[in-house]
Amino acid sequence: VVLGGELVEDPLLCLGIESTAHTIGVGIAASDGRILANENETYKPSRGGIHPREAAQHHASVAHIVLRRALNSAGISPREIDAVAFSVGPGLGPCLRTGATLARALALKFEKDLVPVNHGVAHIEIGRHVTGFKDPVVLYVAGGNTLVTTHHEGRFRILGETLDIAAGNCLDVFGIKAGIGPMPAPEDYARRGVQLHHIPLRVKGMDVSFSGVLTASERLLNEGKRLEDVALSVTEAVYSMLTEVLERAVALTEKREILLVGGLAKSRRLQQMVSEMAALHSAEFKPIPDEYLGDNGAMIAWTGIQMLRYGLTVRVEESFVKPKLRVDESEVPWID
């Protein structure tokens, strides 16, 4: 592998920094496949959703602690790292800039290559790594992203996506408005639900819309319906739409590996529905360990390793964050 103009023997070590939203994470990955460290701290507001500046301040205050924990966990010093990767986007601007600043400082101080990682691609890559899947159809569901994608001709192509809010955001907002808090609270309440109420499903081709689910949930709550039943109705509606568009993508591509990534992929009910759908199509589905589903530093480090092999680095003075970056805007040449 050529690194900084010199030929370097494997294994390479990459330190990855994740800071797109509520989580600041530092991971360390080796090119031989080992995840040496995965340390994370999450900003938890006292009420409501994420305030970008407050989250960024949280990240700045604990970044040195998370970094030290990761290095100690891996048993290495910063000088042993071959490159520093960071989440360049998509995400909240102030949070992204906090992680990028730390990455630039480390790259400059220790004279390491800097690798700008697409956060969405990283979710997929850590999923491919831990499952061993080669070319899956992917459902990426989180608080800020909802899309169906697969790799084709050098990058991930978006087959379908949300037309308004993300699935995770829909469930979080429902939980907050219902007074029970964001996920996983809505799913916890849903387990005690017994009656399904009608909620309109909005599926257009392989695109989905969740704003109507929120409107319907508010109506049901205002009508005095039992909270557990409303939670059951909302989660079933959201997961049914997601599974339907994923099934359409499987039928279209005729691929037989199914990957579920992102924070909302922790849902055991969603995993169950996807697993049942996969069986109908003789496709393989493997749930990913929770530690790699939410935002984490390990996924940035592992994707950084792949990018480093192909020379996909960036100069410090050109390492701008990209809050609106899409999954299909980044090159992914390491998948055949």
Q: Where are the language model's segments positioned?
A:
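N-terminal beta-alpha supersecondary unit
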Residues: 11-90, 119
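Conserved phosphate-binding/catalytic loops in two-lobed NTP-binding clefts
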Residues: 117, 275-300
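A contiguous, well-structured pocket-lining segment that forms one wall/lid of small-molecule binding clefts
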Residues: 77, 187-258, 265-281, 308-311, ...
